[in-house]
Amino acid sequence: MNKTKVESGIKMANEIEKRERQFLGLPMVLIWGYIAVAIFMTGDGMEQAFLSKYIMSLGFDNSEAGNVLTVYGLVVAIASWLSGVMAEIFSPRRVMTFAFIIWMIFHVGFLVFGLEQQNYAMMMIMYGIRGLAYPMFIYSFVVWITYSSPSYKLASAMGWFWAMYSIGIGVLGSYLPSFSIPIIGEMGTLWSSLIFILIGGLIAMFLVKDKKGEDVEAQRMTKKEMLREFGRGITILKNKNVAVAFVVRIINQLSLFGLVVFLPHVYTADFGFTTSEWLRVWGLMYIITIFTNLFWGIMGDKIGWVRQVRWFGCIGMAVSTLAFYYFPAWSGPNIFVTTLIALMFGFAVAAFVPMSAIFPTLVPEHKGAAVSVHNLAAGLSNFLGYGLASVMLIFASAEVTIWAYAVIYVLGFVLTFFMKVQQPGRQIKTTVNTQSN
């Protein structure tokens, strides 16, 4: 019996040691999950640069193509909100597997019954339902990270997550079609995305060995408790700190989504850029975020999550948003200046990385619900980023619109003073310092 206890203790110690093993904050026990996210998002992102244009080439007008994407975006927002709680109830691995299967089935339906038949209703239905998949896949993995990463290294772990996301959707997903479309065309490229989804999904299913991803709360919950847990994805906003963090997270990416509504035209019509030059500026910014997501994830654990969001995120974005307009307005298409503003913006927007760690830290007993609220805020940031620009430009110039975004980031700066977060690692250090004195 003692031998059994010793073996059990050794096994538990090995599990803890494995979970604590890291590389610059990346939990090695989840490394295949991070790789799965990058590959999966490559497949999901391959269509983003050309799908609306391709739908129009089939004979549909701009508004019809836009409606397909709008329905998709609405479903994505809903799925983003539900994904955290679903992962908590049914386990991250199960929800990721479900999402992977949904993506494959409805993408094939979108291609066969929608695009190939030029059936508008089927495009809306199939592509819309496919919108459930990617948020459930990636945000379930976020819940998995909160389960398996040490709390004092959570921002670093989230930085790696967003870096993998950027590599997938922002870099590979955007650049690969530029090579594949001339060879196999748009439909061939859309079919080829299934390869990346299949590889990413299978990696998540079979190569991530961490058992934390199989925790199933549903087995310990009644149906009433399950419904209450889903409801908590909204009622959790009664927590003042969560509500403030929710608003700050919405503010986070407003410029990232909003500037693309009008700056492409401003850069080409007013500042003397070609379309290719503008795209290179914006593409460079995304490449920079791969590295800055990692940098700020690690730095946040060292200098403090809220402090980083306050000064480098909110103030950084206020300054870099204005720079994105005024620097090229003064210099024209100067490569040094455009590289500088891409660097500034890429550094500032990634400084919000700790927000992914702040939400589950604020409500540690309901991490899934906390992640769901974070995801809802991310979806609203997307929606309101576009919406603010669209509304402002009806009444004001592009210059005034830029200032509106900058002022909102200053508002976010003020709000961070009302966001009280007990950062685990800093608590430990403070306690050690106090005891040593």
Regions found by a protein language model. Give the residues of each.
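Juxtamembrane intracellular "pre-TM" segments in multi-pass secondary transporters
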Residues: 9-27, 211-246, 436-437
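Hydrophobic core of transmembrane alpha-helices in multi-pass small-molecule transporters
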Residues: 38, 120-136, 335-350
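Extracytoplasmic gate region of multi-pass secondary transporters
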Residues: 47-49, 241-282
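Helix-to-loop junctions at the C-terminal end of transmembrane segments
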Residues: 80-91, 293-305, 393
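Cytoplasmic membrane-interface "Motif A"-like loop-to-helix N-cap segments
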Residues: 89-100, 302-315
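C-terminal ends and interior cores of transmembrane alpha-helices
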Residues: 101-117, 315-331
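Cytoplasmic helix-loop-helix junction between adjacent transmembrane helices
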Residues: 126-164
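A late C-terminal transmembrane helix in Major Facilitator Superfamily
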Residues: 365-395
